């Protein structure tokens, strides 16, 4: 398999949405719908735009609320254009097959789940940390090294851009979760050499 890894830019937004709309959750994953935009949302935006829809539809899974996916997509579009949503797309034969949300940790300090992340591991005040929050790989490509290739690119770019360390937050769970359900996390931190 010949992979190409590209950083997300507004020019690649169509590939990003094509991946999440058509391949990311082809296995009917309970994680859908998702456009990986929640970590970049403010708590207020999350409360009004997402939890408001959930509260209006008690007992209904978010993926079954008709306007939930379109709301997430609109938020992701805005975040991509503004540069808040950052990460990498993996391609095979010009088709997007994987995604990794990776950003400067400081960008999460006042956004979305940022405070939770910052409280997991206290940094030295002068360190630049690249945070890796999420991977999503098309079902037919899982277990074939796509996430590894994405992570290698994150690490290479972090080194070039002068980051001091890379942090990840692997989920400790036996199975995939539904949207908004939380489980324990562990932190892995690696120095950039």
Where are these regions (language model features)?
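Conserved GNAT acetyl-CoA-binding A-motif
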Residues: 129-132, 158-178
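Conserved acyl-donor/pantetheine-binding loop and adjacent beta-alpha core of acyl/acetyltransferases
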Residues: 75-82, 91, 95-134, 180
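Short, solvent-exposed beta-strand-terminating loops
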Residues: 21-37, 100-111, 157-158
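Conserved acetyl-CoA-binding loop of GNAT-fold acetyltransferases
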Residues: 163, 183-193
